[in-house]
């Protein structure tokens, strides 16, 4: 077997290294950049978008795709700032903008916290596109191209079909009229804002409601890109293969987290639940990881198309470094292997392990919970788990396991390095939760597991046997006495 054959064998296909891989094979037939959820508000907020465009230009892209949420507030000014950034980089070139709308482009001016931020910066809903002639008129004025709920642009002979937000219901009729021209071995690219339900990792929440997957299932040569999820590209479930291929694009502006984590997304008050035990937990003791600027990941893709493969490079566009090994989709899709079939990936994805000699350190301490109330917590500290190069730990699970076989308390946590490249992962992890949830009047041990994105766990770190005394239910808040 030659080196070339080895690199593209089924076993090695997911370990290829971005642009270094592409260098092995020369120039592709087509190259395009992808960023999503850029959430432009003010001229300054377009800085990272412009930096990404400049990087894409250095890479010689033929087009740049943005699957929705170009703006945060849905104002005409946001589209103007997007177009100005584009023109500073690509004016006078043949590079094609492949943009579509997201929920923020239509409705962002009406979201509570966004409205407050908008007003604080001197903008208002008076400039909303939906109050100034509607989306089609504002789109055409800003970008100089006709707006349709479904449309097709062609770049170097490859078709790009977009479905607009509030326009997915039009795709069925559009494909009935035009779908025959998309069939065949040659890939075409579809993009929309919301996840295609039943495909990538976060497509079972706020998605397209199942409208699109049955339609695209007739096209094995379709490679779809979606936005909205704001999931960083460390989640290997962000690429999916079934009847077609679907790819979840990370956000250029800020990361979001999966639910069910003590320090993850949810109300800052901590009134969140039910937890992984199916119960409504007390107010969370651990503060949520910061959002927005503190979770800037600035991630996106460079997509390279050859006649026998599509290579999707994963880039940190703030660091301008390749953030993870490229995903490689073999072609033609109708007969090629499917390395990103979830059943295949779940078996192939490495399982984390803790360093040799790793120990779990436990202590109780007092702190404040998310509501600012004094709380006693169990503090758990241990070395970060490790994975083979190119893979990442997804999260950590801490269990309080009674020795009598009764149900364990289960808590999950996300590493502070979750939204970043591997080099930002801390050497040690530190998580905590309310001691009121621990078993009482029975022996138990604390177990810590590292998990990959498919939920497969490492061997645990295990504490010594502990036993709490009963009586927590007798603890009552102090009553304020009249002075």
Feature-to-residue mapping (PLM):
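A short C-terminal boundary segment appended to hydrolase-like catalytic domains
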Residues: 274-413, 461, 466-482
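Beta-strand-rich modules
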Residues: 438-455
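Recognizes extended acidic, P/S/T-rich segments that occur
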Residues: 9, 397-439
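N-terminal export signals
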Residues: 5-22
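Extended active-site neighborhood of metal-dependent phosphoesterases/phosphodiesterases
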Residues: 76-187, 211, 215-221, 234, ...
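Active-site glycine-centered loops adjacent to acidic/histidine catalytic or metal-binding residues
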Residues: 37, 68-69, 102-103, 193, ...
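N-terminal active-site segment of His-dependent metallophosphoesterases
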Residues: 19-80
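Short acidic, glycine-rich surface-loop motifs adjacent to enzyme active sites
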Residues: 182-201
